[in-house]
Amino acid sequence: MQVKALTPVDDPDKSVPFLREIIGSLRKETEGKATLLGFIGSPFTLAAYSVEGKANKNCFNTKKMMHNDPAIMHAFLDHIAENIAAYAIHQIECGAQVLQVFESWAHHLGPDDFDVFAKPYADKAIALIKEKHPDTPIIYFANGGSAYLERQKDMNADMICVDWQVLMHLM
């Protein structure tokens, strides 16, 4: 994988020109009635989709890359974090009032791999977004991440979602 050859998101108005119109229209439609959420996939989740080429229930190729070529995986995750932050910033500037970061494939990771390959890159993306829009609430959701909920509490997100595995009376 040639990470340096990947195209950065320099100008979202050019790469996703429809987004400003759609989010702007939705914002006008929902104004005073509902909060408009923007959303992004997290770097690990997007990397898994990219490496696997589709949704995959095991993510074997992604895990193989994580452990056999960690330098490439880290460079790829860093690239995604920076670019997905730019995309999220664009959504906010187009009218999104809250942003949710979905770590849809967290359940494929053990706690240690979550700490190495998912958390730092999701947190980097969130920090980059917060630099530009510190007052925009950001929600982080790690599907299956309840097993390592404690590891998420120091993230830059304003809110951490819990999944169905959490016993709410223990919270």
Where do the PLM segments sit?
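The substrate-binding groove and active-site-proximal loops of carbohydrate-active enzymes
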Residues: 3-16, 74
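Active-site loop segments of alpha/beta catalytic cores
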Residues: 15-171
